[in-house]
Structures are given as C-alpha cells and as structure tokens.
C-alpha cells in the first residue's frame, strides 16, 4: 500500500570563500602563509619533486624569495626548475591547494512504512586537502620505538628504484619533512553519521497491556567513514592540519525502548 509508505529527503550543500583584505605584512602561520589577496587556508609548503632513483634522497623543487618576499622558482639553463636533496637550500611556496572543501554538506533520509521507521544521515565533503600529520609520523626514516605505516615497504632500496618513499636511514630527519606537499592528501570523504531503525507497536495491541505507546529502536552513530586514507578523518579540522594524535568519535550502537502509560 503506497499510502503506508513515506520518504522524506533533505539535501544540504554549502561552500565558502575567504580573502585576506588587510594585513601589516605577510607571515607564515604553520602550513599557511597569510598575505593580502589570498585565502588564509592556502597551503604554503616545501614543494617535493619525488625521490632520486640513484640515491633514494627526497628531492625538493628550488625556490628563492624575491624582494617582496614571494617565492619564485629557480630555473636551470634549459628552463627547467632546479631540484635539491637539501630542504634548507630552498624556500616554501604556495602549492595551489586549499584546506577548504569545494562542497560540504549532508543527505538526510527518513523512511516510514506502517509501524517501521528508518532515519539515515550521511555527511560528505568534496575537494580540499589535508596535511596528514598522522601519516607523516608513521613514514619516518627510522626511530626506535615508533611504528611504521605499511607504505614504508615501498621505500627506496637500491639504485634504479622508482618510488615516492625515500630511503630509510635511522635518525636522518632531513629525509622526511612533514611541512611538505608530499603529505598533502585529498580531503574528500563521506560518512554514515547516524542511522536509526525503529518500530511503533500497534495501538490496539499495546492497549491490552495498559500502554498508550510502545516503541523499540536501535541507533548507531559514526558507523562508517570513507576517506582517501584509512584512519584519516578530515571532518573536524577546517585548517587541514589535524595533529596526528587525535581520536575520531567512537562508533556507538544503542538499543532503546520507549514506553508511555
């Protein structure tokens, strides 16, 4: 019976832009550089150029600062941008990435059929980038008592290896620079934020027991998250720089009974 079925759908989507209009002088704020005419969420990092297949060194594109403090690429005689294996021989530069999602919103569904109800809330974000500090912390070049990410198995091992993970050298902090675009990750995600399934018992049935209403339900929160990398939760940090030691909200499942006399 179609008259017993109801479906309510609510779609929400939002986006926003920002621009710094006044500032005494530009300055670096963490992974960003604030300057007039730019967004405060534009990433300003070391630009990486892959891994040297001969040595396993992390390579960086070379930039230098002009008279206005802006980073400009350094070119060789052939017009190609120079690279270096020493991050101290270059400057940070804008990567062209922002931590602001292109679209942020939710999809709410509410179904009812006779005594059954089902409510589902999905949240999502499309676009934007996040500097994955947790991942960077597990891609170190070798520190005693620290865990590694499985991607460390892709590290350079011998001349000729083509990989984006530099060689391992215990204690050499110069091989891994967290403030580099190597650890920029797509912040797109979708999450099954909440789902609730319930049943309202028939009035005639429950009146036999002296009840006015009887409802049984099961509810789940933070049930599923899909993001670019397992464990990465871009939902709660608009700056795109989660500290790496934070915890995402736990998955909660609860069973309930509402009784009205």
Model-derived features with residue positions:
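Outer-envelope beta-barrel architecture signal
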Residues: 3-9, 103, 114-116, 188, ...
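Extracytoplasmic gating/loop element in the C-terminal half of outer-membrane beta-barrel translocons
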Residues: 125-215, 221
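Membrane-embedded beta-strand positions in outer-membrane beta-barrel channels/transporters
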Residues: 8-10, 106-108, 194-198, 254-256
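Membrane-embedded beta-strand positions of outer-membrane beta-barrel proteins
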Residues: 9-11, 120, 216-218, 257
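C-terminal beta-signal and terminal closure region of outer-membrane beta-barrel proteins
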Residues: 30-55, 152-161, 177, 225-261
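Conserved small-residue
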Residues: 1-99
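Transmembrane beta-strands of outer-membrane beta-barrel pores
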Residues: 13-19, 113-115, 124-128, 194, ...
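Outer-membrane beta-barrel and related beta-rich outer-membrane complex signature
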Residues: 8, 19-34, 127-156, 226-234
């Amino acid at each position: 019976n179609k008259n017993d079925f109801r479906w309510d759908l609510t779609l929400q989507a939002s986006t926003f832009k920002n621009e710094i209009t006044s500032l005494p002088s530009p300055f670096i704020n963490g992974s960003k550089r604030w300057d007039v005419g730019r967004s405060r969420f534009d990433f300003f990092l070391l630009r990486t150029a892959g891994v040297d297949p001969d040595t396993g060194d992390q390579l960086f594109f070379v930039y230098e600062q002009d008279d206005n403090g802006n980073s400009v690429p350094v070119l060789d005689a052939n017009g190609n941008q120079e690279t270096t294996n020493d991050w101290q021989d270059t400057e940070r530069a804008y990567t062209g990435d922002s931590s602001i999602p292109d679209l942020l919103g939710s999809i709410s569904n509410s179904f009812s059929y006779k005594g059954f109800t089902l409510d589902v809330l999905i949240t999502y974000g499309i676009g934007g980038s996040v500097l994955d500090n947790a991942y960077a912390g597990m891609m170190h070049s070798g520190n005693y008592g620290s865990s590694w990410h499985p991607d460390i198995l892709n590290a350079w091992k011998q001349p000729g290896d083509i990989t984006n993970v530099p060689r391992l050298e215990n204690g050499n902090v110069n091989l891994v620079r967290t403030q580099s675009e190597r650890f920029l990750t797509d912040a797109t995600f979708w999450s099954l934020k909440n789902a609730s399934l319930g049943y309202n018992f028939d009035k005639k049935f429950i009146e036999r027991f002296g009840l006015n209403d009887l409802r049984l339900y099961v509810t789940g929160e933070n049930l599923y998250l899909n993001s670019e990398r397992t464990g990465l939760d871009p939902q709660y940090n608009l700056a795109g720089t989660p500290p790496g030691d934070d915890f995402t909200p736990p998955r909660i499942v609860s069973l309930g009974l509402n009784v009205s006399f």
